[in-house]
Amino acid sequence: GAHASLRIGFTPDEEIGRGADRFDLAHFGADYAYTVDGGTLGELEYENFNAASAVVTVHGRNVHPGSAKRCMINAQLIAMEFHGMLPVHDRPEATEGYEGFSHLCAMQGEVELATLEYIIRDHDRASFEARKALFESAAAFLNAKYGAGTVEVALRDSYYNMREKIEPHMAIVEAAQQAMRDAGVTPRVVPIRGGTDGARL
């Protein structure tokens, strides 16, 4: 049967988080759109992670180890202490479904300077904000222990859960579910454990 006009777009840079950077929504001219991505038959997703990155910088004091008593501050050890303050069950290897996490992606360290690079992910906005607050409070605790400015945390939000924008327009999701049923496919709503270009648009 007849249908409304369709628009199809390709975003080649989705996997590196830049697929939506040059996407001209006005020129695309659609009232709403769906992303077609890999997954199992019947998967329908309209929720993704809230995402942030965190860079933790630890400043130490390097002194000759032979005369280091009461004056050396080893940034690497404080970095390890910071990481140890984060819950062990909130790591990617211990989570699934709607469970969020903090993931240590990279670390570099010497006695004088150490850096930890994390990504923070959670579907729930309040839980997402609490995860970021934990980074701040861990740093505050260590600064109280070792001196102001020892630990710095730089947090940056990357993208948000598109569910917040979609929920007022659930007819879009229901239309997709009905289309799947019409094609003999049982829709299964699952959360995206990642991001998507749609969340950035």
Predicted segments, located by residue:
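Conserved strand-to-helix beginnings and helix N-cap segments that scaffold or border functional pockets
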Residues: A20-D21, K69, E129-K132
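Short, solvent-exposed loop/turn segments at secondary-structure boundaries
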Residues: Y46-E47, A68-R70, E164-E167
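Acidic/histidine-rich catalytic neighborhood of metal-dependent amide-processing enzymes
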Residues: G1-F49, R91, T95, E99-C105, ...
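Alpha-helical metal-binding/catalytic segments enriched in His/Glu/Asp
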Residues: G1-E15, A54-V58, H64, K69-H89, ...
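Short, solvent-exposed amphipathic alpha-helical segments in soluble enzyme
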Residues: D24-H27, N50-A51, I73-N74, A133-S137
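Generic beta-structure capping elements
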Residues: D37, H59-R61, M107, R156
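Metal-dependent amide/peptide-bond hydrolase catalytic core
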Residues: A75-R200
